């Protein structure tokens, strides 16, 4: 026992449990039949190549599945990362807590060198918030929506072919994901008409659309939205009462040289006052530098109250990591970050691969999208309902053997385990007649992957 209490001291009722929050702020009981959030198959599909490698140890395999430049393009050499980390860390107390939203010099570097924000924006480096990768920042954005809405069950609107994790991160935070209508003819792109239809749908279900996500270049389709398209979509969303707008630019550096990055300074200055208070831009090192495991991304947040709230979320959840910040300072600390060697090692070969993908798939007669970024989105309808070559069977989702391709997932299994080329089946993106093909590779490797893919699907009967 401790002798800690003074004779005249009254600590109140210490023998009863007590809620941390006042009764009016307690989370209400709300029963729901919540589905399971399953692990992403994008991290495991490439492992299925092992079956092919075991049977054909002397043949090349091709991984065109996950967009992981840190793997497919070799990544950043460890000795270069070590040097960057040594430059970043202070000489003493090098493992102390960092700033929950990113160290000041890193935020200043991205503010001035990467975006070149001018005084007209009204922004400062305090409006730049770093996190532990894109997923971390998305989680904080979802939490911000719930905090601002003071209720669960509302909607975040995504495209007709969304990145798989958009629909999981929302759900984890008590938000529903609604996919806007979209067709192959418009590349599954967002339109103002699609926003209108989605708002009507939500209203009929007694819900509201609290957030919307625009991604350019897009994952999985590779679609690229022009400057004017982005401005129009952002402003239209605000006009229609959507209060949280997330613009995911994580692939914007990985474009053709003549396309380049968006001028976010110009884009931000062109927005209305209301739009500036509603929009968040995200970018990072995962794709531009192949820094997949560095887990470094940042948001530009014009709403100062949101900055305050996001700081609060960061202090109680996840801080930026030191190695990721060191890499960010190495890149953003130079005058023109997109000319950094780490970036060029990704953008150079990927641009060459992209040009080859367009030329080759067109020559072979495929229907596909291949604008910018890492991916081509390919219509594989002609290869469904086909029979696998004699003597070859694949396992279906129940583990039974079959000799027919009925679904895009069957095609993925056939290509990966029997042909040695890994892709992502479009079911992951709510488009079961498509596959995603990553060309973030050396052009020679990409050429081999296309040949293996084409030879394999044309062998189906």
Regions found by a protein language model. Name each.
Residues 3-22, 83, 109, 202-205, ...:
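Conserved core segment of the aminotransferase class I/II
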Residues 4, 8-133, 140, 460:
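N-terminal small-domain helix-loop-helix segment of the aminotransferase-like
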Residues 45, 64, 110, 128, ...:
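Generic structural signal for small/hydrophobic residues in well-ordered secondary structure
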Residues 61-63, 282, 366-372, 426-428:
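Short beta-strand
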Residues 92-241, 252-274, 446:
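Conserved core of the PLP fold type I
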Residues 104, 112, 118, 122-123, ...:
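PLP-dependent enzyme catalytic core of the Aspartate aminotransferase-like
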Residues 248-249:
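Walker B catalytic acidic pair
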């Amino acid at each position: 026992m401790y002798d800690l209490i003074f004779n005249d001291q009254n600590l109140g009722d210490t023998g009863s449990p007590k809620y941390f929050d006042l009764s009016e702020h307690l989370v209400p009981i709300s029963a729901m039949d919540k589905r399971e959030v399953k692990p992403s198959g994008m991290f495991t599909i490439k492992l299925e190549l092992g079956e092919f490698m075991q049977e054909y140890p002397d043949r090349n395999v091709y991984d065109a599945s996950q967009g992981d430049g840190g793997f497919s393009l070799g990544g950043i050499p460890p000795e270069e990362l070590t040097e960057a980390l040594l430059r970043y860390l202070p000489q003493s107390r090098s493992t102390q807590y960092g700033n929950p939203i990113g160290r000041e010099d890193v935020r200043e570097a991205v503010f001035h060198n990467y975006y070149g924000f001018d005084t007209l924006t009204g922004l400062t480096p305090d409006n730049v918030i770093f996190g532990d990768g894109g997923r971390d920042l998305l989680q904080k954005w979802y939490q911000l929506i719930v905090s601002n809405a003071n209720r669960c069950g509302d909607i975040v609107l995504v495209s007709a072919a969304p990145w798989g994790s958009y629909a999981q991160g929302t759900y984890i935070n008590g938000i529903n994901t609604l996919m806007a209508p979209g067709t192959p003819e418009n590349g599954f792109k967002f339109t103002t008409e699609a926003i209108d239809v989605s708002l009507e749908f939500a209203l009929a279900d007694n819900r509201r659309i609290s957030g919307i996500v625009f991604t350019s270049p897009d994952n999985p389709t590779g679609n690229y939205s022009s400057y004017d398209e982005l401005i129009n979509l952002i402003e239209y969303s605000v006009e229609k009462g959507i209060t949280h707008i997330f613009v995911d630019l994580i692939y914007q550096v990985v474009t053709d040289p003549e396309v380049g990055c968006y001028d976010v300074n110009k884009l931000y200055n062109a927005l209305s006052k209301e739009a500036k208070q509603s929009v968040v831009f995200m970018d990072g090192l995962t794709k531009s530098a192949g820094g997949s495991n560095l887990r470094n991304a940042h948001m530009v947040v014009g709403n100062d109250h949101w900055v305050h709230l996001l700081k609060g979320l960061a202090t109680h959840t996840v801080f930026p990591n030191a190695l990721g910040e060191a890499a960010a300072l190495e890149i953003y600390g130079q005058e023109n970050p997109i000319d950094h060697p780490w970036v060029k090692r990704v953008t150079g070969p990927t641009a060459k691969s992209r040009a080859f993908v367009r030329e080759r798939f067109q020559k072979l007669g495929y229907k596909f999208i291949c604008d910018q970024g890492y991916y081509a989105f390919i219509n594989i309808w002609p290869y469904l309902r086909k029979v696998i070559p004699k003597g070859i069977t694949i396992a279906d989702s129940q583990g039974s053997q079959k000799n027919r391709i009925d679904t895009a997932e069957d095609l993925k299994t056939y290509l990966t385990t029997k042909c040695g080329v890994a892709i992502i089946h479009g079911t992951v993106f709510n488009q079961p007649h498509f596959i995603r093909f990553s060309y973030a590779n050396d052009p020679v490797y990409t050429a081999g992957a296309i040949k293996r893919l084409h030879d394999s699907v044309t062998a189906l009967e």
